[in-house]
Amino acid sequence: KLMEDIYDRCQVLVLDAEGLQADRHAIKIVENNMEEDIDLILAVGAGTIHDISRYIAHNYKVPFISVPTAASGDGFVTTVAAMTLDGVKKTVPSVAPICVYADTDIFSKAPQRLTAAGISDLMAKYICLADWKIANLVTGEYFCCETVKLEEKALKTVKSSIQDITEGEEDECEQLMYALILSGLAMQMIGNSRPASCAEHQVTHLWDMEVINGPLDALHGEKVSVAALLVLEEYKRIAAAITQGRCHAKPYENEDEELL
């Protein structure tokens, strides 16, 4: 209802979803078509729309409001944007929304593929939290137990409701959206993306940059889920090698050194 009330007072830009990426091309399209005297940006859509919106809001020093239409990822309330700039995937400073309007009646009816991508993005947090703890043990990096507890509780709730979520049950879809927003808030609380993006996201960044592959017709959460499985297998291999005494962690001296 709020969006309907202000719709007539807004300039509306609809970006073609086909091949849309958070990159300079998309930024240029928006900048070439938006009015000069904007004082607020409404991001109505999923993850890519939000990355583009928060990046532009940061550059133009205006606030933005998040209106997620699908529970497809955890990037709705972060303070960084995942952008492909000059062929390189980067996490760049941006702004968090001043508020979020997530209508259950809308996002619970989103295409199942988008919702499944959100579940996948969330389940990869198990890898992120493990990575974070390892970094804490090896390098002394700050590790927030309270933040981890909040994320683990949300993960447990969603994990037990996956079937209901895929069937569009509103209460369970709300829990998924809550968990995704919480993941974004965790990044705000810590001041970086450590609680939500680690080894598995590094793999997806290489895919996004097409280092050894062509364009992929895959959603972010879909790529994250595959990457999480690949990372998990590699971690199992490393763990076995450590147990068997075939490799060990070196004392941490500086960030430029290889740790294994």
Residue ranges and their predicted role:
Residues 1-40:
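ATP/NTP phosphate-donor binding region
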Residues 13, 42-44, 65-67, 102, ...:
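General beta-strand structural signal in soluble alpha/beta enzymes
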Residues 33-36, 57, 90-95, 99, ...:
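Solvent-exposed alpha-helices and their adjacent loops that cap or buttress functional pockets
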Residues 34-56, 60-69:
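A short, small-residue-rich loop immediately preceding and capping a beta-strand
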Residues 44, 73-77, 218, 222:
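Active-site histidine-anchored catalytic micro-motif
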Residues 59-157:
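A glycine/threonine-rich phosphate-anchoring loop and its flanking beta-alpha core
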Residues 148-260:
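Active-site segments that bind and position negatively charged phosphate/pyrophosphate groups
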